[in-house]
Amino acid sequence: MAIGQASHEIAATVLRLAANGELAPDFTLRGLCLLAQADRLGSVADDNQEFLDRIELARELIAGEGCMDRPYPFGSPRTQRALFKGGSVWRDQALYDDSWGEVILTCGLPGTGKDTWIRANCPGLPVVSLDDVRLELDVTPTQSQGQVVQAARERARALLRQRQRFVWNATSLTALRAQQVGLFEDYGARVRIVFLETVWDENLRRNASRRDAVPEDVIDGMLGRLEPPERWEAQTVEWFCV
């Protein structure tokens, strides 16, 4: 790998990590470095000094990118998204947003209140719901979901071709949600990921009251696979504790 390309990728990684401060205001790369240093100082290992030297190098890189204590202030949300997707853009320029509208993608375990949030915040928008597709196709949550996802994606494509804003209502628990984000962006939409979470007991209570309750052991398995969305995954990412 060429040195220039490697430097570009390292800088992009630093900027992506720092951007998570938009989702969790107490998060900073300064704090992350301090945590890594404390963890290493509390352990006994032959490579301790080498690891500590790497932390100091990371601090220098982060300071050079101007995001030690805050996310980098990009020229525009479109510029930020372009860089996070790997584009070679100047981070301070204000790229024009040529998207035709926004598609919302929900993320969260069953019972976190995705349907309630959609009703309160997206009145009038079409909703592509994987739960509804499952009911129509008579597929349970424990069965293969391939045909469910395919049918939902076809409905999404129909709306995208019409340049119709809509909500993609699914658990979207892992980084594979990038496939959906990529589909929506390929059709010229900008994407907002909305991540909802709640305490475990409340999560189970809400799920039990649903018409199509998901077995608790299935939700427990989903929790083990959950990867909360990071800020770099879409043009807008929001976290809500509900």
Locations of regions flagged by a protein language model:
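Conserved GTP-binding G-domain of TRAFAC-class P-loop NTPases and closely related GTPase folds
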Residues: 104, 124, 201-242
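Acidic, metal-coordinating catalytic cores used for nucleic-acid/nucleotide bond scission
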Residues: 168-180
